[in-house]
Amino acid sequence: MPARCWLCPSFCALTGKGVVVMLRAIRKPIRHKHKMTDQTAAPRDMANAIRALAMDAVQLADSGHPGMPMGMADVATVLFSKFLKFDASEPNWPDRDRFILSAGHGSMLLYSLLHLTGYADMTLDELKKFRQLGARTAGHPEYGHASGIETTTGPLGQGLGNSVGFALAERILAERFGRDVVDHYTYVIAGDGCLMEGVGQEAITLAGHLGLGRLIVLFDDNGISIDGPTSLSTSEDHKKRFAAAGWHVQAVDGHDAEAVTRAIRKARNVTDKPSLIACKTVIGYGAPTKAGTAATHGSPLGKDEIAGARAKLGWNHEPFDIPEAVFSAWRKIGARGKSARRKWTKNLAAMGPEDRAEFDRRQKGDIPPAVDEAIAAFKAKLAAEKPSWATRKSSQEALEVINPVLPDTVGGSADLTGSNNTKTATLKGASRADTAGRYIYYGIREHAMAAAMNGMALHGGIIPYGGTFMVFTDYCRPSIRLSALMGVRVIYVMTHDSIGLGEDGPTHQPVEHLPALRAIPNLQVLRPADAIETAECWQIALEAKHVPSVLALTRQNLPTVRGAGDENLCAKGAYILAGEETAPIRLIASGSEVQLALAARDLLAKDGLAAAVVSMPSWELFAAQEDTYRNKVMGGDGTVRVACEAATGFGWERWLGSKGAFVGMKGFGASAKAPELYKHFGITAEAIAQAARRLAQ
């Protein structure tokens, strides 16, 4: 006889040994539709395999988040078994659907799916090493640790922001190469936390505005946060919120496989707007005393609770043991995409030779020779004309020669296009009407811009760059950090890089931002001194496949301080711009302060003191050079070194040695014209020269 549900008066026909039901405030019962046997693998059995692996791995690690994987197992089973286009044997197939676990704390959901569907590097041993040093199964999913992990998530909302970039990249590439080779969806599992985060709201409104019809978000609507019920901190109606942002919205019982199937099918047919499917779920589904509570969010369930969950779920198997019928069914799902991939391969082979060559090149991330040729010609022109441009203007002029020969680039700005100089003549704005546009008007959404650029870079075939004022790197720093952590080619065009921006004052003058950005590992900060260096810095950023770049650019005009030459001198991070290698004094500067160092050298020459000026656009690149080169540029230990930068001096001691001084900012800026500010704060050629004189005595 069927057993009585543990929280409702109705009978469920799952098994006579025990059942599990939805735990909601209204205590609505779940109506099970599948009987569990040893011979068949019903959807509920397959979902329970995910639940069991999540419980077991978290318990073994004595750390982790079992609640979300248990709650979203039914939804994930439907998605992977009926809709997601992938081939586990070819995880990097360019036309696969992208699955993003924005709620990255539920990483065992993803790891379980990757193991069950047959990704070669996600073995059972890896699941057993969950959260251990050196394992592919880190606490939160990390891009590059294992196949099938499309992006690094964990900081909530980032995956949702990434998804906008994934969907944009798919749409732009489909316009270029056609639906025969680019025809996939982006699916996201997001939780309450993702929707509470500011980056989540920015991403939601941007996706709705752009009409990203192949973006489908599955919202784990479990009503629980770490502190307890979400009613403690929020009372908004997410469904109305998404609808107001231009999304197609549905709500379903997340434990009703048929309802979830219908909803995803309907969402896939909505082509003019992104889709939200709010899946009402029970966090920790199946746990006899903890389901539906915050206790399942971020702690192991405990042996007794797991035993009870096994009984409730009818899962009478040892830890990490998956019945053959269930395992076989999952492996068939992992191989189901082979036929679609083979058809795609034929379509790819049928492309014209030029289109095929470009598609392959862009997937590899290679830069065509035409870019180097264009930059070389541009540098020669600059050397002849010697313009006095702000480096933001120099950046735009560099892009004017790069973008026509590099179709990979997708530019944008956070409502500062005219100030960042990020749009060029050949780029059209992306919109619902123009889905081929390579320029994104992000609006005042700096965080979503950065997160979306990460998504575009991760998708492949796109090199994204986007601009805002440098002070607003604070608004997108979490995504910049993830760019560096993942090692993706994203180019941040950050203008108005110092007190040189002038009258807007200290709220807009970045003084601590250069050291703060330099503190991020695997991020190269490039601060060019003139138009030629700016062109070289763009070349460096484009060639760095696995390193994101920040271009720190001026508002104020700067003179051309060097000739062209074939060699990219900025590529070594620092070089002697003027003077002799044997000079006993080094005047070191970056960006707009290089001209001050050159003027200070002239002042010292009048005193009979020989100095060499070092232009240092990138600390990171210079640090990567051999000791012999660094010593050549900086001089020996006894060399007098004076550094100048219109920023705080944090970190400069690394380069100054025993006889060094720094000329720069000691606090926040002020509102006035740039020349007046430089004089007011003592950032002058005379101040540099005086520091050198003092140290040379």
Predicted regions and their residues:
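A glycine-rich helix N-cap at a beta->alpha junction
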Residues: Y119-K129, A207-V217, A244-A245, A484-D497, ...
